[in-house]
C-alpha cells in the first residue's frame, strides 16, 4: 500500500493547473475545522487532498489523487477517519493567460472507519473549477459545486449503500497548484 501511495503521489506531481503540454501538475488543499455548540459538544476535523498528474496536451491532464480525513466529535468522543485514492482526468480551457476553467473527474477507491466500524467502497466526483495563474507556475484553484456518487459496504454486513449528490452554489473549495515543465 505504501508503494502504491508513493507511486501515485509521484504521478500526481506531474500535472499542472494551467494548460501546458508535457508538464507535471501537483495540487492540493488542506482543511482544519473546530466547532463547539451551546451544549458544549466539540467537533474537530482535518482533511488533506493532494494530487499529481501529467499534462498530455493543452487541454487534457491525467493523474492520481488522494484524500485523507479525520473527525473527532462529542462526549464520549467518537473518532472517524476516511481515506481514498484513485485516478483523475481533467479538461482545461484557458480563457486568457491568467484565467482557465476546468472540469475534473475523480474516481476513487475509498475506505473509512466510524466508531470502530469499517467500511469500503467507490466514489466518483465531477466538479467545475476556475484556475487563476500566478507567477512561476503557481495557480490558485476555486471549485464551486460537484456531482458525485458513492457506494459503500460495511465490513461484516450484507448489502451496500449508495449516495448521490448534486451541489452547485452551496459548496466551494480553494486549493493551490504548481506546474513543473519537463
PLM region spans:
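Predominantly the C-terminal beta-signal and adjacent terminal strand-loop region
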Residues: 70-76, 126-182
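Cleavable N-terminal export/targeting peptides
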Residues: 1-23, 181-182
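Transmembrane beta-strands of outer-membrane beta-barrel proteins
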Residues: 24-28, 62-64, 85, 101-105, ...
